[in-house]
Amino acid sequence: MSKEDVIEVEGVIKEALPNATFQVELENGHVVLAHLSGKLRMHFIRILPGDKVTVELSPYDLTRGRITWRKK
């Protein structure tokens, strides 16, 4: 899967789960499980419930995603 295949959507963190996994409510109302991308882990970016984030979804599984950006 290449970078052109991913779907980028905005969302809000609903709940923090173990192992850097989060429940994210997307703009369209769907709730997905998302994990932190490598760069966010590497730079110790803190993500808390209520933060606005950008999530990349795979077209093959729309229930899981990767958090790639935290809005300021």
UniProtKB/Swiss-Prot annotation:
Query: Which residue ranges does the record assign to the S1-like domain?
Result: 1-72
Record keywords, A-Z: Cytoplasm, Initiation factor, Protein biosynthesis, RNA-binding, rRNA-binding
Indicate where this protein resides in the cell. Answer: Cytoplasm
Q: What InterPro entries does the annotation carry?
A: NA-bd_OB-fold (IPR012340), RNA-binding_domain_S1_IF1 (IPR006196), S1_domain (IPR003029), TIF_IF1 (IPR004368)
User: Which family, according to the similarity comment?
Assistant: Belongs to the IF-1 family.
Subunit structure, per the record? Component of the 30S ribosomal translation pre-initiation complex which assembles on the 30S ribosome in the order IF-2 and IF-3, IF-1 and N-formylmethionyl-tRNA(fMet); mRNA recruitment can occur at any time during PIC assembly.
Chain's role: One of the essential components for the initiation of protein synthesis. Stabilizes the binding of IF-2 and IF-3 on the 30S subunit to which N-formylmethionyl-tRNA(fMet) subsequently binds. Helps modulate mRNA selection, yielding the 30S pre-initiation complex (PIC). Upon addition of the 50S ribosomal subunit IF-1, IF-2 and IF-3 are released leaving the mature 70S translation initiation complex.
Which protein are we looking at?
Translation initiation factor IF-1
Q: Which gene encodes it?
A: infA
